[in-house]
Amino acid sequence: MIEYLNVHGNPNIGVYIYANNKIALVPPTLTEKDKKKIEETLGVEVIETKIADMIINGVMIAGNDNGLLLPRIVKPEELDYLREHIGDKVRLEILEVRQTALGNLIAANNRGALVSPLIDKAILDKIKSVLGVETIYQRHLANIPTVGSMIVVTNRGGVVHPGVSDDEIRILNSVFGVEFTTATVNFGLYFVKAGLVANDHGALVGDETTGPELMRIQQALRLRG
């Protein structure tokens, strides 16, 4: 299933929403209608939260079905709230690195993870352990270090910024164990994560996404209509 969505009129829904196959972390300001659409499309429990008192959950959080990586600026009460509502569904871990926009710097499915070269190599083993992945790889894509913003990957397929090379696509296919396709969202936006939230069950795209863009994403992520 794939559906259109905006957040307060903004088509860049991936900035605000983090999702895996178990939960979706959304701003507390979403309407009940939008929360229901997220729940039904992705087949997950919707949990309202902020990170560091900001509603940009998709930018601040990285993870997969095994673990969530949270920035060092998460507030203690926010962490307590997440632990209470997530329980033992997913491991929660604060990543003690200078960078805080972890969702823009790390992409993961349940098989592999790609990490920005901006993140200290010394922390890679911890990331691999929290996410429980077989493969972790650190590099830029198309000479851009914010690799998490360029990728949306599930356990079924992946989409990536059109500026990447064929060699880089082959690397992504190997790291994540799925096939990648270049794609855009929201009428030509290359940084696909900004306008796309997806898991193995479904996807939500920003409401400025064109029909051809939607079809390409749907095929790449191997989703039903």
UniProtKB/Swiss-Prot annotation:
User: What does the entry give for GO biological process?
Assistant: cytosolic ribosome assembly
Q: Name one GO molecular function term.
A: translation initiation factor activity
* SUPFAM superfamilies for the chain: Pentein
What the entry lists under InterPro entries is as follows:
eIF6
Which keywords does this chain's UniProt record carry? Initiation factor, Protein biosynthesis
Entry-linked HAMAP family: eIF_6
Entry similarity comment: Belongs to the eIF-6 family.
Q: What does this protein do?
A: Binds to the 50S ribosomal subunit and prevents its association with the 30S ribosomal subunit to form the 70S initiation complex.
NCBIfam families from the entry?
Answer: eIF-6 (TIGR00323), PRK04046.3-3 (NF003135)
- The molecule here is called Translation initiation factor 6
